[in-house]
């Protein structure tokens, strides 16, 4: 049995408002009351399941996506499907439909991914749902400021609450974690309050974030006081003055967790 997945991310902040330059066919033209989409760069985190005849497979993803003029998309995605991981850059298209939802179509090596996004009154994407048959996946969106990131952008206090799944005895078991972290130039010391399969524990950990060159993506490696290693693909969410926090997706096959860790 696959347990339902949820994730919480605070509401997105303001971005730079520009107009999409695409000209959809008259039958697809959005009403004049629709908000003008906000172009820019976004961090996206989603969780859900891919349904199958025999069983459901949990899935989660983290994306960095750019909304460009002319309804064009460019991005990078890291995705977990069960115990496997895949990642790729991609391109796509976006258009406003008659219901004032943005329809996105991403071209990926493993297929075309379609989703619909709800915008707030200022045209900022907040939530989306996957529209591919056989998927039950929702995502939340955060704006990112232009430019690359530094590990030192996270210096200070970072807090999080997240849920995930662990592979045990041939099936997925739920887990939940609350964390408090202190960051200094890419090094982290933290304390985690966790429950795995209903068994609670409190454990300290340390780790190191190594960012890719000229990027906001990086690899985060952590080890707790009991010697257990944890590995993540991380995306620092760049703000206009330092980092707003970071998203991560766990790489360890037996643990599937995506989290939004907020810089205080």
Model-derived segments and their meaning:
Residues 27-264:
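Mature soluble binding/inhibitory domains
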Residues 1-12:
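Bacterial N-terminal signal peptides that target proteins for export
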Residues 10-21:
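Bacterial N-terminal signal peptides
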Residues 19-29:
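Signal peptide processing junction and immediate N-terminal pro/mature segment
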